[in-house]
Amino acid sequence: MSASKQLLKLGLPKGSLQDSTLDLFAKAGFHFSVKSRSYFPSIDDDELEAILIRAQEMAHYVELGAFDVGLTGKDWIIETDADVVEVSDLVYSKASMRPVRWVLAVPESSSIQTVKDLEGKHIATEVVNITKKYLAENNVNAHVEFSWGATEVKPPELADAIVEVTETGSSLRANKLRIVEVLLESNTKLIANRNSWNDPWKREKIENMAMLLQGAIHAQGKVGLKMNAPKDALDKIMAFIPGLRTPTVSNLADDKWVALEVIVDEQTVRSVIPDLKRAGAEGIFEYHINKLID
């Protein structure tokens, strides 16, 4: 009989982070297929088994060992007080590549200006424990109630204030709310069960996954440029290349020419390529980068 197959159980966030997470994994080289209404994506890696679950519950189930590894926010690790290994910071969110913020917000017309003004007030939020800790640190007594969603619509009739997550602030502004204070900045993290982390095979698999995911994040907004350059114009051409590092220079069969290769910010390409061409570069082409590993 053959030895049993090694398997790593992966928890993926269901909901607002799902699409951006699956896109990130695809760039890292892991391609999932999710059927309609299914919570069990298929993947092109027979050593992985994935389940979609709400990010709010992820840290709890990773701690229990239901998953070897999962993705969730720092906020939910703190909120659930989960004992997990924080393997890697993955700074991306549903709409951008930046952290989200949990903020104290009130109606624009509210007299509340600081956390001290919350004494005796009602606050609605999904992160009850984070909010209670924040109030305790500021010596404020207020009633904190769990919000099942649509938190922005609750003030002023159903709550005096809310603690809500925001990425751009647009939803708060649309509901005529203003931010009083920021409680917490949060980003997605790759987390692991402690027993799984102590298993050599699983740890290597998790570390490889973290490396590839980080590489995919670092490659966001970057492209590669290749070109041929006459040696007598090399210094002039190099002056126009705003690369992450010094370009790679390779000799060509014609000893009067060299090949250059460099990684640049994609937003600079529209101005850089014309400058390179005018400086004497030829055969310039741009290519997409999925991963950038330092």
Swiss-Prot record:
Places the protein is found: Cytoplasm
Reaction(s) this enzyme catalyzes, per UniProt: 1-(5-phospho-beta-D-ribosyl)-ATP + diphosphate = 5-phospho-alpha-D-ribose 1-diphosphate + ATP
Pfam families: HisG, HisG_C
Keywords: Amino-acid biosynthesis, ATP-binding, Cytoplasm, Glycosyltransferase, Histidine biosynthesis, Magnesium, Metal-binding, Nucleotide-binding, Transferase
GO CC term (a single one): cytoplasm
Entry keyword Metal-binding: yes
GO molecular function terms noted in the UniProt entry: ATP binding; ATP phosphoribosyltransferase activity; magnesium ion binding
Cofactor: Mg(2+)
InterPro entries recorded: ATP-PRT_HisG_long, ATP_PRibTrfase_cat, ATP_PRibTrfase_HisG, HisG_C, N-reg_PII-like_a/b, N-reg_PII/ATP_PRibTrfase_C
Family assignment from sequence similarity: Belongs to the ATP phosphoribosyltransferase family. Long subfamily.
Function summary: Catalyzes the condensation of ATP and 5-phosphoribose 1-diphosphate to form N'-(5'-phosphoribosyl)-ATP (PR-ATP). Has a crucial role in the pathway because the rate of histidine biosynthesis seems to be controlled primarily by regulation of HisG enzymatic activity.
Listed name of the protein: ATP phosphoribosyltransferase
Primary gene name: hisG
